[in-house]
Amino acid sequence: MKTNDIVYGVHAVTEALLANTGNKLYLQEDLRGKNVEKVKELATEKKVAISWTSKKSLSEMTEGAVHQGFVLRVSEFAYTELEQILAKTRQEEKPLLLILDGLTDPHNLGSILRTADATNVSGVIIPKHRAVGVTPVVAKTATGAIEHVPIARVTNLSQTLDKLKDEGFWTFGTDMNGTPCHKWNTKGKIALIIGNEGKGISSNIKKQVDVMITIPMNGHVQSLNASVAAAILMYEVFRNRL
C-alpha cells in the first residue's frame, strides 16, 4: 500500500469518512473507547470495510507515523480545478485566496490548511512542481481541513496570478520591508502569497505582487515559520471582516 493512499489519525480518518473518500478502515486490534465506536459506526454507515490490525502493521503502513490506531485507505486526493475556485469567489463579496509559492514542508501545509478552514479562506492554490502536495502527513496535520478547503494545483503560478488580476484580485506578498500588517487595507478581493520556507517568494512572482506586507517583530529572530506567518495574516483579514 502506498502511503499516499492512506490517511491516519482519528480526526483525519473521521473527516475522510464523512467526505465519502474511504475504501477500507484499519483499526488497532486492542483499541477501545468512544472514538473507536464512533469511527466504527461511521464506517459501517458509509459501507466501508473494517479490518482489525496489529499496532505493528499500522506503524508499517504509516512508515512509523503517529496513527493513534486509525488508518483509512482512501481514493486519490481530488484537487479542485482553478476555475471551480474562481467560480466560487464570484459568488462571494470579499473572497480571500491563499497562494503557496514553493512550500515544501507537509506539516506547514497541513497547519496552513487548518487555519485556512478556520478563517473562511475561499481556496488554496499550490504549484504542481517543486512543492509539497496533499499527503497523509498533510491530511493528519490539517485534522480534516482538506475535506473543506478547496485546493487547486496549477502548472504555472505566474499565469494564475494574471488570471486572478483579471478577476479583480489584489495580490499581496510577505516581505520584511512591506506595509505593516496592522495597516493593511483588507477590503475587496485578496490573493495572499506565502513563499518557500527558506527562500521566500520567488523573484518572478514578486514582480507581480501589488503590495508587500510585513509582520512587525521586536525580538531577535528575523523571520517566522511559514505556517505561523500565514496564520497571522489570514487572521488579520478575518478579524478586519468580522
Predicted region positions:
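Structured adenosyl-cofactor binding patch, chiefly the S-adenosyl-L-methionine
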Residues: 19, 140-143, 206-242
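Short beta->alpha connector loops at strand-helix junctions that form conserved
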Residues: 28, 54, 101, 127-128, ...
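Active-site/ligand-binding-proximal alpha/beta "capping" segment
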Residues: 172-225
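A short acidic, often aromatic-flanked loop/helix-cap motif at beta-alpha or helix-coil junctions
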Residues: 56-61, 78-80, 157-161, 179-181, ...
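Short, hinge-like loop/turn segments at secondary-structure boundaries
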Residues: 42-44, 67-71, 140-145, 189-192
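RNA substrate-binding interface of SAM-dependent RNA methyltransferases
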Residues: 15, 21, 87-179
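N-terminal positively charged helical leader segments and presequences
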Residues: 1-87
